[in-house]
Each structure stands twice: as C-alpha cells, then as structure tokens.
Amino acid sequence: MCGIAGVVSTIRESNITEALVHHMCEQIVYRGPDDEGIYVADGAGLGMRRLSIIDLSGGHQPVFNEDRTAWIVYNGEIYNFPELRAQLEGRGHHFYTHTDTEVIIHLYEDLGADCVTKLRGMFALAIYDKTKRKLVLARDRLGKKPLHYALHKGNLYFASEIKSILSVAPELAEVNAQALLEYLYYGYVPDPITAFTGIHKLPPGHLLEFQDGKIHTRQYWELPEYNTHAPKSEEECLEELEQRLLEATKIRLISDVPLGAFLSGGTDSSTIVALMARASSGPVKTFSIGFKKDDFNEANWARIVAKKFNTDHHEMILDPDVVQTVEHLTSSLEEPFGDSSMLPTYYVSQMARQHVTVALSGDGGDEMFAGYDRYRIHEGRRVFEHIPGWARRLFRDQIFPRLPNRMQGRKFSYNVSLPWQERYIDHLAFLPAFERDTPLLSDDFREILDRGDDPANVLRRYFAQAPAKDPIDQLLYVDTKTYLVADILTKVDRMSMLNSLEVRVPILDHLVVEWVAGLPPEWKLRGKQQKYILRKLAERVGVPREVLYRQKQGFSLPLVHWMRNELKDMLMILLEPRTLERGYFAADGVRKLMDDHLVRGRTMTGRIWRLLMFELWHRNFLEKYVKPAGLHSLPVVADSRRQSPRSPSAKDALASVPVGG
C-alpha cells in the first residue's frame, strides 16, 4: 500500500526535478511512512510513499522492466500476482523482486494498458513508457483506491490525494461551484469532478493515457447485467456464495505483516471474521470500538462474535476529544465530506494500527446485498405506483401545496407522488425538493448555481445506463456507482490511511460483485428482510442469530449528544461573521437552523453537521491555498461538465434550500 504522485510534461527538457516530486510525496507521508522512491527523466517524474506489506526488503518503487523503458508507481494490492508471475515467467520474463508491482510492469510489456484487465485487487497506478513518451493511469474497478489528475500548462499532474497536486500547482485551487452544490445535496462530491475546477478524479474502472499533450480516457470494466442467473435452490446459492466469498477472503490474508479485521458486530463484518477464522491457522485479531454513552455502545455484539470464533479481540470504549479529532480530520480532507461515520472509522483504524498493518472489513455488503433501509422503504412505496398518474399529479400539483407545512407525513405524501426513480433521488437528498421554507442558500450563491447542473442529474444519468430492469437492481447499481465510491470507500481509504493502515474488502472482490449482481433481486431483498442470502450465509458459517437479526446500526456514534455538548461551541462558528461573510448562506436561514436545534429541541443534526464540515473545510484546508475563501473566489460560471439537454437548472432544483428537518 502506498501513496503515489508525479508529473509528466510535453516538453522533454522541462524543469521537473526530484525536489518537485519529493515535495508532492511529502504531502502524503502517512500513506506510506516506510519508504520513498522517485524517478525523474525526460520530462517525467514519478514518486511514491510506501507502506510495506509484501516483500518488505525488496518492495522499493518505482519499479522498471528489464530494459528500463517502462516505469511504474502503484498504490494497492494485487491478489492474483503469483499466478500472473508464473505465466509471465513462462513467457520469458525475468524478475528481481517478489512484489506484485513488478508483475504489473511486465504485464504491461505484453498487453499495454489493457494489462489492468488481468489484475484482481485494489489499485491506483501510473506507468510511464519512455519509448512512447506516454503516461498511463488506471484505477481499480470499484474505486477502492483514489487517483486524481490535472492538466495544467502542458503538464499532467497525478496523485493519490489532491493536496499533492496543489502543493506544486497552487493556482489550480479554483473552487468548483458545481462540486459545492453536489456536496450540499449528497454530503459528498461524486466522481469525476472534485472541489477544484481543474482537478479531476479518474473514475473507477477507467484508464487514462496522456501522450503528445492529449488526454484519452476509456472505461475498461463495467458492472455486468443484473439478474442473469437464478439458483435452482437456496442450498445451491449458499454453496456458491460461500465458495466465492471464502476464496476472496483467503487471498486477502496474504501479508508479510500482522493482519486483523474490523468487527462491529453487524452481519457483514461478522461474516468476514467467520470466514477468516476458517481460513487462518491461528486466532484472528479483531478490533471494535464503542462510546461511553450506553445508547452508542455496540461492543457487546462484537464481543459475542469474537467469543464465538475465538478471536484475539481488542476493544476500546471511547470518550474522545471529538473537537480535536474533527479539527484534525477536516484539515486533512481535501473536499467537504459530510458522513459523520468517518469519526468511528478513524478511531477504529487508529486502534487497529497499534496491533496490525492490514485489516479486513465488511464494507460493500449493503450495496451488493440490499442492506440499506431505503431499499425496503422504496419497495413498500411501490404500491402507490398503482394509483393512476393523473391522480398522483393532481395530488402533487393541486392538493399537496395546500396541506399544512408541518403536517405529519407531508414529506411522505409528496415523495410518493413522484415517479419511482425521482422518489429515490428525493429520498436521498439532503435538501428535499418538497420543502419551501426559509431559504438557506444566499441569493448570490443560488445565482451562481443557476448556471450549473441540477445535482439530481448525477443519479438520473446512472439510472439511465443501469444494466438492470428491476427497480431494486437499478438502485443497487446507482448506489455502487455513487455512494459506495464517493462516500463509503473514500471514507475508509482516508481514515485508514491517516493511520497508515491498509484495509482490504473481500465483499468487493470484483468476481464476487459480478456473481452477486447476476442474482435475482429476491435473493437480496426478500419481503422486509434485507441482505437475505448474506444473512443465511452468515448463519451457515456460524454467526449467532441474535447478532444477525437485530436492528442495523453500523458505526453508531453519539453525534446528537456531542452537538449539544462537546461540539456546541464549535457549532457557533456557523454564526460568526467570518462564516456568513463568505456569502454562501443566508444569515437568517443559518440562525433559524441553529435555533431549531439548540433552542427548540428539533434534531437538525444531519444538516448542521454538513454545514459545519463545509465551513471547517474552508478554514482548515481551502484557506491554505485561497485567502479569503468564499463566494467571491468562485469562478463566474459553475462547472458544466454534467449538463444534459433535459437537465433542469440547479436553481430550479434548489430554489429554496430548506431549513426545517
């Protein structure tokens, strides 16, 4: 596991130096504290920071082929590299190390950029081909590892994290208004844009080739068609799933350093621990956290699973300095990020790193097996589709606007009047379209956003291209392309890497993902039972039923309590002149939101947290590059790369950002 960074110029005699590449690498030392390597020649510079996992003494990068005409830096783990190496040796290739990195560069010699289609694992890589003066960038199929790039003044910059690019090209710190809008809508910035107009994310499953000053990107992998194979019986389905997931877990146990697993006591992590216990010769090291407030302490469930599988269990009940943690995380995150579960992810990574260098997790189970409540809720509301369209439109356009604003079920009433895909989008939105209360966005900010794209179009485009007919399968596809990548996997990567910990995700092995996608949706969501077949597998491998059929909580944390106590003073920055003078939000709207939460007792946690993360990102990250940062620093026209002919404007979508919850 590493962090990578570099730059390739169209000019052979450019001023790319080792010092410049070193400076880029310095920004991400925590991603690889064990080693640094740099290659500079002919207008190209590649750099890496290494966290040693495999071949501890021989894993230095960059790595080259036999005649040193191709060089690679790479972040990730390739689990099928022993088989690939044997094939390459059979074709006459010679190796000097036992690393997966060297396998990739020899595979590139044989197959060119398409070599990535042979890789099984997680990766973000950069290959410089001296003969062709070409740079190849590639990102793994599901987006487990990040990769950013920017073309600026004839130079192609790339890096695991944006801060490496900004450290040598600070003029690229032009804030992307479209990204800010999408953050406020989703709580994250969806691929491929970033918070900076000139810097982009390479999407999962994509290649980029840079040659002669031109960028060419192409997709090398896509989720397959859903619902293509129906098992003859539940037993057959369980046998196949068990074999595939056990094998995906086994290959992720290869390591030359201590290895363990996150254990929350939920279905996903418990299943992975059960499979690890079967595949391991000794006790599995497991890690769980809880909080001192009893309502947010799930450590007892993890304890039950740990006892069942005789793990070497490590547990920590926390009463953290949450203010200090929030300050630290927002100074490290390069984009506003609104998922508060980054806090427990950071804490469990911090604890695990005291004992291991690699941890397996159960991430991906919800998106693959329909684990979120919103899938079940969506299915329940499909009954309203039997109401004629004219009747739903009449209710939405004529009756609904006359209902009392705070009528119980008003949001539900509006939501079920929408077409099913729009209903799901509205359900996800932080800023639901049905509310027209006191606006939160300033008039000036909405005017800028009016030139941009309706953020809901991100999901609409994925719905349009989903290789699925059943609505549940379409929802799983959309979430895999958006929420999984830009929220869940981003969170896991950033929080684990801040602690120099590698996290591996067996459920998101692409062979498992492809097979599970092909299952009929009723194997995932059956009636009200979410993750049906995964729970049955968990029972089969010994996870106690009391763990499997309790209410899902995930990484639970006392955020409401913190925001009325430990974080209360921090929240007050939202009312400071410095914040309001940025020009994004209407002062009256922010004050009402805060009063509702702190004075009237309404739970506005999600919205306030999202605004707090937005402001702290400005203070702790953005203002390193843009001072003062605010509405005045936005470009005149918002990013328009997501425009489509049928796209309503952002202003139409969010004409009045609501304050009420």
Positions of predicted regions on the chain:
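Short secondary-structure boundary/capping segments
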Residues: 330-332, 373-380, 628-629
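Cysteine-centered catalytic environments shared across enzyme families
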Residues: 1-333, 345, 349, 540, ...
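Short beta-alpha connecting loops at secondary-structure transitions
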Residues: 165, 288-289, 335, 379-387
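Short hydrophobic/aromatic residue motifs in ordered secondary structure
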Residues: 35, 146, 269, 365, ...
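Adenosyl-5′-phosphate
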Residues: 1, 41, 167, 198-204, ...
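Alpha-helix capping and helix-loop boundary segments enriched in small/acidic/polar residues
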Residues: 293, 317, 336-339, 386, ...
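Active-site adenylate/phosphate-handling loop in enzymes that bind or generate adenylated species
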Residues: 141, 347-407, 483, 488, ...
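Glycine-rich loop motifs involved in handling phospho/adenylate chemistry
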Residues: 259-268, 293-294, 340-343, 368, ...
